[in-house]
Curated annotation (Swiss-Prot):
GO molecular function: unfolded protein binding
Keyword Thylakoid: no
Oligomer and partners: Homotetramer, a dimer of dimers. One homotetramer interacts with 1 SecA dimer.
Gene that this sequence comes from: secB
InterPro entries attached to this UniProt entry: SecB, SecB-like_sf
Protein name per its UniProtKB record: Putative protein-export protein SecB
Superkingdom of origin: Bacteria
Source species: Pelagibacter ubique (strain HTCC1062)
Length: 140
């Protein structure tokens, strides 16, 4: 099956690591395994079948915890969609499923490097994100 889109570029649009002070770092270092990874995907048309797809990862503690660090990345993919794609569902699948599945290994590597370089080495995400499954759940 041929793909009905092509990723013509990827870049880090925004990346953030926030640990406000030393007591917070010491607290977070012991609690970071309880942090949750959240994902958000949004897109916008650029021009002539080109779409900007932003995949956002946020790694943080529960809102009520006062001593916490926050990590976030917005990874942008520039996608050229085949002109034959006119169905809204097909476009949605490209944006929410196909592109994220393709770029996720690089995005995860970059994000884990951010965590390591921020003083929190050895973090691993328990399971790989299955964007196909998330897309199917969303459709139901």
């Amino acid at each position: 099956m041929t793909e009905n889109y092509k990723i013509i570029g990827n870049f880090i649009k925004d990346m953030s690591s926030e640990t406000p002070d030393t007591p917070t770092y010491i607290f977070v270092r012991d609690k970071i395994s309880k942090y949750k990874l959240n994902i958000d995907i949004n897109s916008k048309a650029v021009k002539n079948g080109i779409i900007e797809v932003n995949t956002i990862l946020r790694f943080s503690d529960q809102p009520e915890i006062l001593k916490k660090a926050h990590f976030e990345i917005t990874y942008t993919s520039i996608v050229k969609v085949d002109e034959k794609v006119s169905d809204k569902k097909e476009m949605e699948k490209i944006i929410l499923c196909d592109v994220p599945n393709k770029i996720y290994p690089d995005l995860e590597r970059i994000f884990l490097n951010l965590l390591t370089d921020s003083g929190y080495p050895g973090i691993k995400f328990e399971k790989k994100i299955d964007f196909t499954e998330l897309y199917k759940q969303r459709a139901n």
